[in-house]
Amino acid sequence: MRSVLVASLVLLASAAQAQAPAAAAAAPAQESAGAEAPDKDVPPAQDMAPPETPATPVPTCPSALPPLRSPIAFMPGELLEFDLDAMGAQAGKMTMRVQRPDNGALPVQIEAQTNTFFSKVRRVKGTAVSYLHPRTLRPSRYTEEATENEVRRTADVAFVAKDRSVKVDYVVGKRPGQYNYTYDKDGLDVAGAIYLMRQLPMKEGLPVCFDVYGIRRLWRLTGTVVKREHVSLPVGEFDAWYLTGTAVRLDKPKQKREIHVWISDDARRLPLVAVGTLDLGAVRATLTAYTRPGEKEKRAKKGKEELKW
């Protein structure tokens, strides 16, 4: 959960945030082996290593994302609440909130925090905000602030459509750094990507490909809208579109994250479930409540769930 979205990719949220539970699972093993805990003010080597140039570049996206459907399915005041599960155990909570327009942008905020159980080995609390264009839903800026076992991590990311650049200014512990990337056809962030996906013109077989920022790196997500299916959750019954794909880290293609997302097939286009798979298992975000302007709040009730994941 070093990037506030397991959810997310949100999808990617899944690709990015999923690393926190993985680290949590590894912590007990290190302790049992007698390994010394690293100085909390010294960032791990993998956090500070500059991006590499792979011998074989990741294939580019065949095409840009299709025109988005209208009208926009969400608006300021919408609040979505999720349970986060890692490797079969509840790991924490996450919220996604659409804020009021700010200087011509539509901010969307994601907050995530581990629960008491997971905090025994990995305490994580973080917030991310994506500033989206109100029509195209492309980001102009993305900010992130998280505390992980008392180590503070921040990132301020600027997206420039003119030259497709992504400038990353970050601080891990007390050490600042900067990365510069160039995205291919579409550049998103892990917080805003799920909102754009809600507006895709869903149909079976629709290809989806874009670059996404997460964990100070740029990833390329390639996927497909697989099919329309019925999903039963404690929060309600839904007909939903099922999307699946793989996120590949551009500077280190061997790092891949499998992603599965279900989005309701109705005017609300709710992100129902997002699953990211790791070597240790699956990390999942499940919608448990939603509040939308002009609608009655809906919360999960005890009941059966019908979903393959």
Question: Where do the language-model regions lie?
Answer:
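Sec-dependent N-terminal signal peptides
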Residues: M1-A20
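Signal peptide processing junction and immediate N-terminal pro/mature segment
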Residues: A15-E36
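Acidic, serine/threonine-rich low-complexity disordered tracts
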Residues: A29-A161, Q199-W309
